[in-house]
Amino acid sequence: MTRQLAIELSGRNIRVNSVAPGFIDAGMSAPIYEDKKVRKTRSEAVPLGRLGTARDIAEAIMFLDSEQGSYVNGHEFVVDGGVVHSLLNQLPRD
């Protein structure tokens, strides 16, 4: 959907991107991380070694909305501390 909208709206100088958050300790998910075992397990699953914050997500969005991000269009920004890429390494190779 993001890519298609980016294609359709780019002629109007409208950029469309999306942000896909990982394990974020904020808002509705905050109660989940009150459990110390869950917090530890999920933090250890993140290559950066910590849960994300609302600020991490906001910074990605601010970049996309800034002059520095003005040539980015049609992309999904995965803000997960590297989880997606680390999981790919765990898949069986045969």
Indicate residue ranges for each PLM-predicted region.
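Short-chain dehydrogenase/reductase
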Residues: 2-3, 58-61, 65
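Alpha-helical segment proximal to the catalytic Tyr-Lys
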Residues: 7-11, 70
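Active-site loop of short-chain dehydrogenase/reductase
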Residues: 11-14, 75
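Conserved SDR Rossmann-fold cofactor-binding beta-strand/turn motif
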Residues: 15-21, 25, 65-68, 78-80
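Short, flexible catalytic-loop segment of classical short-chain dehydrogenase/reductase
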Residues: 21-31, 85
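A short C-terminal helix-loop "cap" of Rossmann-like NAD(P)-dependent dehydrogenase/epimerase domains
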Residues: 32-46
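A conserved structural motif in NAD(P)-dependent oxidoreductases
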Residues: 46-57, 68
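Short C-terminal tail/terminal secondary-structure segment
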Residues: 62, 73-94
